[in-house]
Amino acid sequence: MNISSSIDPNDEKKYSLSLEDNKEFVPIKNFWSTALINATFFDINDKDKKILEKLTDICYIPLEYPSFKIEFRFEPNEYMKETTLIKTYHFVEKEKDELRKVEGCEINWVDDEKNPTIKLKTRKKTRGRVRETVTTSKEIDSFFNIFNTKDTDINKELVEAQFFRNDFLENMLEYYLNIMEIHYDDNDEEEEQDDEEKA
């Protein structure tokens, strides 16, 4: 079985990068969740990990170059109503380093307890003779925040887009096996040497 991770952005077809459609391919349990966690690029909390175990495929779908979208496919689960989540990166025409806008998607969580993007806090409150339970929520770091693009930082989104296209999807197997090498450029080495000399 040959797993090819080379992506030609000018090719208009859809890439099912986990080879899910290959009849000879035997799915690897927790392949994508393990690869995403090992990449250490995203803030992934404990609830995220459980939900990502339901992730069966990640598809890279080229749009008008150099724009593209990423499709995350999940098996039916007890956390959210959707089985497909989509993130779209719209670039300035022919400018692969200039992101114009991004589009996420709405996620309908089964209930607040299943929502990994918030932390619930319950406390007892007394009003006269009545004692009631009050539940409040606080937004927290989560992988699934990438689909909320309401108040997004376009520079951070560009880094994310480049990570998916130029790094993660080309090296998914290495990330899964946790053998991905970290490459430093010459500037990084010079800065490291300067720090050592100062020490």
Where are these regions (language model features)?
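Mixed-charge, low-complexity intrinsically disordered segments
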Residues: M1-A199
